[in-house]
Regions:
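Divalent cation-coordinating acidic motifs and surrounding scaffolds
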Residues: 1-152
Length: 152
């Protein structure tokens, strides 16, 4: 049913290296937030097999004139479990690309990083560049169980 607030959405094209594809979807209140721009992160030649991300980030810049942070960027990622550490580390390159393109530092990296269990080991975390970047704040502690199942 229709609510009292207007909503809009922005959806990516189907993304993925194989016949299996996924899309990123942003749903937002159009009376509060507007889209200023979007792009797909260029992570290399997909058909050549030397791209970084299984599903490259669909980066969206928003305007929110009534909030303290009036412009911000959302960067979604659903990493491939078998390459989670490499894809999470490559978010550093996406982060710097957003800063270089739009000159903005209010960036939220979000999604299913597959960063728990055996996908990203404790020995891999120190080499993930965003973990040591002082400009980044990790909002979910490593100890949080973010799975929907009863076990990890």
């Amino acid at each position: 049913s229709a609510g009292e607030h207007p909503y809009s959405f922005l959806v990516s094209v189907p993304l993925g290296r194989t016949s299996y594809k996924e899309q990123y979807l942003f749903v937002y209140r159009s009376d509060m937030v507007s889209v200023l721009g979007s792009y797909y992160y260029d992570d290399g030649c997909e058909s050549c097999g030397n791209d970084t991300f299984s599903r490259e980030p669909f980066i969206v810049k928003f305007s929110s004139p009534t909030t303290q942070v009036q412009e911000f960027v959302l960067v979604p990622l659903h990493s491939e479990p078998s390459h989670a550490a490499q894809e999470i580390d490559a978010l550093y390159d996406v982060y710097t690309d957003v800063i270089n393109k739009w000159g903005i530092k209010d960036i939220i990296l979000l999604g299913d990083f597959n960063a728990d269990c055996s996908y990203v080991t404790s020995s891999q975390w120190p080499s993930i560049r965003l973990r040591s970047l002082s400009a980044c704040q990790w909002l979910i502690p490593d100890s949080a169980d973010t799975t929907v199942a009863d076990t990890d």
